[in-house]
């Protein structure tokens, strides 16, 4: 199941939904919930049959509304359903954000980013100072995805974060947000002795130039 994230072959919807509902392995069900996200997005873009898209969304919603479901399955289901434009999804994201479980709160930030709903900008920015590095990283990516340019000063500060996952997320966000200061920082970061961070900065620079050219 892993590796099917970018796959949108409609013939796989039935098997994936069946795995989500019935597989005895939590790991497999979690992977199925994640893989179905591509179909939700494809449905929003009118790239698959509407009835099939609805089938996918109903399966994910069923998992989210079912008590006793493993947390990891519900987290991936929330991230996947976030691509949907259905009005009830916003409440699901909000519920996830206020969950007592850290993993679900992180997934809520991922979902905010995928929703492309700018109403989540302030919530995402507020988590840039979270004591939890996974939350800071997810928040940074969300600020980038939601094009929250007002968050740039806080993102610049996070480049000194002690956690690499946070710094990498910030580099991604700067690539999405662009601007003179961001490009200067990314250019400098591309010469980092840390190969992973240098590669992330180079990729972010390319991303920044792509978005800049697409706006011309």
Which role fits each region the language model picked out?
Residues 2, 18, 34, 75-79, ...:
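Residue-level signature of alpha-solenoid helical repeat scaffolds
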Residues 2-5, 37, 82, 113, ...:
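Structural signature of alpha-helical solenoid repeat scaffolds
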Residues 9-21, 42-66, 86-98, 117-129, ...:
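Amphipathic alpha-helical scaffolding segments comprising HEAT/armadillo-like alpha-solenoid repeats
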Residues 10, 25-27, 69-72, 102-103, ...:
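Alpha-helix N-cap/helix-start positions at coil->helix boundaries
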Residues 14, 30, 58, 71-75, ...:
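Alpha-solenoid HEAT/ARM repeat scaffold
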Residues 36-41, 208-210:
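Hydrophobic residues within the alpha-helices of tandem HEAT/HEAT-like
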Residues 49, 63-89, 102, 106:
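Solenoidal tandem-repeat scaffolds enriched in leucines and small polar residues
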Residues 199-216:
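Terminal, low-structured helical/coil segments at or just beyond the last alpha-helical repeat
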């Amino acid at each position: 199941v892993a590796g099917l994230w970018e796959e949108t072959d409609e013939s796989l919807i039935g098997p994936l939904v069946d795995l989500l509902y019935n597989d005895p392995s939590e790991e497999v069900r979690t992977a199925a919930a994640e893989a179905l996200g591509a179909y939700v997005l494809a449905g929003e873009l009118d790239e698959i049959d509407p009835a099939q898209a609805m089938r996918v969304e109903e399966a994910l919603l069923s998992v989210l509304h079912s008590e006793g479901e493993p947390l990891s399955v519900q987290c991936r289901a929330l991230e996947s359903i976030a691509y949907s434009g259905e009005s009830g999804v916003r409440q699901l994201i909000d519920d996830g954000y206020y969950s007592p479980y850290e993993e679900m709160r992180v997934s809520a930030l991922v979902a905010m980013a995928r929703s492309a709903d700018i109403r989540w900008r302030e919530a995402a920015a507020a988590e840039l100072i979270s004591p939890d590095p996974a939350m800071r990283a997810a928040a940074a990516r969300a600020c980038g995805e939601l094009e929250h340019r007002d968050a740039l000063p806080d993102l610049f500060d996070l480049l000194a974060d002690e956690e690499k996952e946070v710094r990498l997320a910030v580099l991604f966000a700067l690539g999405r947000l662009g601007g003179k200061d961001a490009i200067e920082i990314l250019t400098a970061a591309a010469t980092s002795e840390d190969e992973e961070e240098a590669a992330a900065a180079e990729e972010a620079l390319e991303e920044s130039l792509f978005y800049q050219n697409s706006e011309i």
